């Protein structure tokens, strides 16, 4: 754990060299980077951490600006500049950090990313609500979301299963199409996330006043965008928005891959990140 001045964040650090910071997805925690952290720390100073209110980090009630926590973590670890590797909404936080402090970020790798200010299609949001209510009845779900109830383990397991099928796998796929260890790890992280979220003080992300959706043209650092071709099409569209909006960005498409390539295709993603980081390191 490290005290950033505003909270306490659980983190791991290994290796020496140029700094990279791995920012996990909202449906996971820092363990989703197990393979990448171990491999990349051979040549880089690798850092991974849990968001505030996630994993081993401190709880928080009320609004939280995760991109500011990321920059505060870099300050606490005396990292002046880093490549940020962010997945899902961790990618959104990485981009917001880069826009808030462009001198602190020398490259971005965005894996199935989210985006601050992006307006999700109503059909996508409606499907998510329907799936949640199919897993847990409305009355209990409302109580859980207020963080003032003891969650029923069967509700936790049901919600984790639904979320894993909807987001991690993607439409029309079955768990058998994912390596068993990847499916098990995804379910474990989701179960622990819901068990904690539903029994802890309620917090909500607070996004920058000037969101990334209107500022992609300001990003000039090398940017790699990774898209899983089996994940929800509306999430794939966000990756496309990044590649269209960031000049010179590169898109990597991974077939038969859902929302967490770091878990489902660890070797492929690690190789792609290593090649990208090597290019960044060799830039004049």
List PLM regions with ranges.
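Conserved HGGG/HGGXW glycine-rich cap/lid loop of the alpha/beta-hydrolase fold
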Residues: 5-59, 66, 73
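Catalytic active-site module of serine/aspartate enzymes centered on a nucleophile-bearing elbow/loop
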Residues: 245-284
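Conserved loop-alpha-helix segment in the C-terminal half of the alpha/beta-hydrolase fold
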Residues: 38, 205-257
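Alpha/beta-hydrolase fold catalytic core
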Residues: 1-20, 42-44, 79, 203, ...
